[in-house]
Regions:
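Gly/Ser/Thr-enriched, mixed-charge loops and adjacent short helices
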Residues: 12, 16, 34-39, 43, ...
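N-terminal small/polar loop signature for handling phosphorylated ligands or for N-terminal nucleophile
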Residues: 87-150, 248-308
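Short glycine-rich or small-residue beta-strand-to-loop segments that form or flank ligand, phosphate
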Residues: 85-91, 228-231, 240, 407, ...
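Glycine-rich phosphate-binding loop plus the immediately following alpha-helix
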Residues: 156-186, 323-346, 351-362, 417
């Protein structure tokens, strides 16, 4: 195995090395720490594909690591009976177009047709295109809501769902056989176009995607045209599809946050373009103070997550959490479909193990089977696929995760913020007809089912030493599990890496505490972070908030 310094020297010795890559490598000459950080490993490839910091080296996102991954994907696909066609999309992130072109060049050289969106488009539109065009796989160049220094390479299967662990392992095995310089086949981009191996996805595909979302309407739309919205795409891809959908719905009172309207991979107004974070929604909230809308909607750069704020009744606006919106929409969909007689027999809703436990009593009230999966919407998409294989895809009525991902139909197999926009607008309009806001709605649900409070604490571990620290922390928690957390006895520990949970093995620890509270520890699959999910329940808002605050302090202690 080559050392980091040997790899560094080999990269610099390459003829015709990309100028930007060469400049960065020359700039760190003699800096052992910088060289090691860029070359001590290859970027990890898993079910989420690749994700990493932009830059030079094997541990960075650059045209060479993208080429290598694509060659491995091509080798995998060519060894299967799947269609030799791959759809590619990219969002607004820096180098998105470059990586798209490089991936297409590699695919074309391997006799695989690359179907490329001609401009940046949402991730769910890529999931749609894979199935719509009959592709064997899909690639989306995105790092979702990560900071601007990141980009990624997300791989989808022929079903439009993110790849399974089994497929990821096969693709990884193929990638590991590829030398990023000598082992990659390439054609000139224009030559690939002329040969018919690189083709542009036409507008009909995208228009039909928006129509498919529109067809997911649950209610009759009464009052929806009266809604007044402020919308921000957070300098990402959402504007085109969201505005097309709103026009179909008859929602014309839409004000777009001007500073965040244009795609910009530097995300100048919000370092973390994540609608879960107040800072990302701040410009929208400021505009709300002037425009006084019924709703503020924000979609992340690849338009698969949707954040919402509503009037708080005190002259301001209150952000709705991902769990709260998931519960509002689950209740709205169940209530409306039962009322309209459109609820299927044996309905199924799906959520994840880290999403709110409040979904359980809500689903039970309406006679809906609630399935829980591992973290990641790909597992929700997998459940849709299983129902489809059984000939009962219509049983699926809704899926959500706490990180602002929602999907109410089988038109795509990933979270879809365009679909979420439809659902949120529908629910807001329905409650408005009852003289209520979405804030009133969640308050009524809390009074009915109990006050559930969920929070996420993220602990960052950067660089080479960070990975080892994360591994050692998880090892320690397994070897010496806590007997109590925040003063609450640990009644049961579930280790998803060893226990017979009925789910695939995963590096997740779950602590069930006295009083019905819960704490879960999970290293991120895409970032150098350990995520701790807190869940508290109380008879009042104050009680649940107090327990949550205690759990947050305890989480910090666990991570030290």
């Amino acid at each position: 195995m080559n050392t980091a310094k040997e790899l560094y020297d080999r990269w610099l010795a390459q003829p015709e090395l990309d100028t930007a890559v060469a400049e960065e490598l020359h700039g760190i000459a003699g800096d052992d720490a910088a060289i090691t950080d860029r070359f001590y490993r290859d970027l990890e490839f898993g079910t989420g594909g690749l994700r990493g910091v932009l830059g030079a080296g094997t541990n960075r996102m650059n045209l060479y690591t993208v080429r290598k991954a694509t060659q491995g994907l091509a080798d995998y696909l060519n060894a299967t009976d799947l269609p030799k066609k791959i759809a590619i999309a990219h969002d607004s992130r820096n180098n998105g177009e470059l990586f798209t072109r490089e991936a297409a060049r590699v695919l074309a050289a391997n006799d695989i047709t690359a179907c490329v969106y001609p401009r940046l488009e949402p991730t769910p539109a890529l999931s749609w295109a894979v199935r719509y065009l009959g592709c064997g796989a899909g690639v989306c160049i995105t790092a979702s809501h990560n900071p601007a220094k990141y980009n990624g390479y997300k791989v989808y299967g022929a079903d439009g769902c993110q790849i399974t662990l089994e497929v990821a392992d096969k693709i990884l095995a193929a990638i590991e056989k590829v030398d990023c310089f000598d082992g990659v086949k390439l054609v000139d981009y224009e030559a690939g176009v002329q040969a018919g191996r690189i083709v542009s996805i036409d507008d009909k595909c995208l228009d039909d995607f928006v129509q498919a979302v529109y067809d997911q309407r649950v209610g009759d739309g009464t009052g929806i045209e009266q809604l007044k919205l402020v919308y921000t795409p957070l300098n990402g891809t959402g504007l085109e599809c969201v505005k097309k959908l709103l026009a179909k719905l008859g929602v014309t009172h839409v004000t777009v946050v001007p500073e965040q309207e244009t795609p910009d991979g530097n995300f100048p107004t919000c370092p973390y373009p994540n609608p879960e974070i107040r800072e990302a929604m701040q410009k929208g909230l400021e505009l709300c103070d002037k425009a006084h809308p019924d709703l503020l909607l924000g979609t992340d750069p690849d338009c698969d997550r949707c954040g919402t704020a509503v009037p708080d009744g005190k002259g301001g606006y209150r952000l709705i959490t991902g769990n709260e919106m998931g519960i509002i929409l689950l209740d709205y969909i169940c209530r409306t479909r039962l009322t309209r007689g459109t609820m299927p027999k044996d309905p199924v809703a799906v959520t994840t193990i880290v999403s709110t436990d409040m979904a359980t009593p809500v689903a039970k009230k309406y006679g809906v089977e609630l399935r829980r999966t591992l973290t990641g919407f790909k597992f929700i998409g997998e459940q849709i696929g299983k129902l489809e294989a059984e000939g009962h895809v219509e049983r699926y009525i809704f899926g959500f995760e706490e990180s602002y991902g929602y999907l109410s139909g089988g038109h795509v197999r990933d979270k879809d913020a365009v679909n979420a926009t439809l659902l949120v607008c529908e629910a807001a309009a329905w409650y408005a007809q009852q003289g209520m806001t979405l804030l009133d709605a969640i308050e009524a649900l809390y009074k009915e089912f109990g006050y559930y409070r969920n929070a996420l604490c993220s602990f960052a571990f950067e660089g080479e030493t960070g990975m080892y620290t994360m591994q050692n922390l998880m090892k320690t928690l397994r070897a010496d599990p806590p007997k109590e957390i925040a003063g609450y006895a640990v009644e049961r520990v579930a280790d998803y890496d060893t226990d017979g949970t009925g789910l695939p093995r995963a590096n997740v620890l779950e602590y069930h505490l006295a009083g019905g509270h819960k704490l879960m520890v999970r290293p991120s699959g895409t970032e150098p972070k350990i995520k701790v999910y807190l869940s508290a329940v109380g008879k009042s808002e104050a009680e649940a908030d107090a327990v949550n605050a205690e759990l947050a302090k305890a989480a910090e202690m666990l991570m030290k």
